[in-house]
Amino acid sequence: PAALLYAQMLQGCLREYAGLEVPFTRGKPRAGDAVLTVDTALPQNRYTLSIMPECITLKAGSDEALCNGVQTLCQYIEQHGAVLPALEIEDWPDLANRGYYQDCSRGRVPKLDYLKQVADILCRYKINQWQLYIEHTYLFRDLSEAWREDTPLTAQEIMELDDYCAARHIELVPSLSTFGHMYRILSTKTCCDLCELPDSEKIPFSYTYAGNHHTLNVSNPDALGFVKGLIDEYRPLFRSSK
C-alpha cells in the first residue's frame, strides 16, 4: 500500500512537470521503466537512485527511505522535465528528527485541505516531524465561548490529518500552551476566574492587553485540573508518543 502512494506521487510529478501520463504496475520491469523497490539489504534509512538511459532504479531499505527517494526523484523531474541527465545517488539523513513547528493560533484558522498541502510540502523536503500548535483554534468541547467566532479545527480533522501525515512518514505532534498564551480562553465568562488578572473578561480587547494578561493563575486550585482536561482532550487525537 505504501509503494502505491509513492508511485502516485511520482505519477503526479511526471504529469505536472514533464507532461507525461505514465501508468504503473507490478511485476518484471522492462527497458525504459522506473522501478521502485524496497531492498532489506540496505540500511533502513538509506536509498539509492540510478538514472540511466535504459531505466530508472530506486532501491530503499524501508518504506520511509523509499518515500524519501521518490521525493528526490520528483525534485529532479521538477528541474529537468522529461529529459533527465544520468546520475547515481546514495542518500540517507544525518538527523533522525527533522522538524517543523507551525502556530495555528494567529490569524485565520487553516482548513484541513491547506494543512494537507503543507504535509505534502514537508514530505517533499523530507521533514519527518510536524508540531501543530493550537489555542482557541481547536474545538475544545467545553470552550465554545473561546472559539465560536472562528472556524476551529475539529477532532475528526486532526485525526484525518494525522493519518495523512503518517502515510507520508511525518509524525504529527500535538502542541498547546499550559500556562500562558490563553487570552481567548481566559477572557471568557466560563474561564475568567482562572486568569491571573481579576475581571479580565471586562477589559476591552487590545493587543497589548492580550499579550500581557493571558496567563493562568497557578495559585487557583482548579488551574491544574483545567490544563489536564485540555491535554486529555487533545492528546489522544495523535498517534505520536510525544
Model segments located where?
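Contiguous, structured surface segment used for ligand recognition
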Residues: 1-98
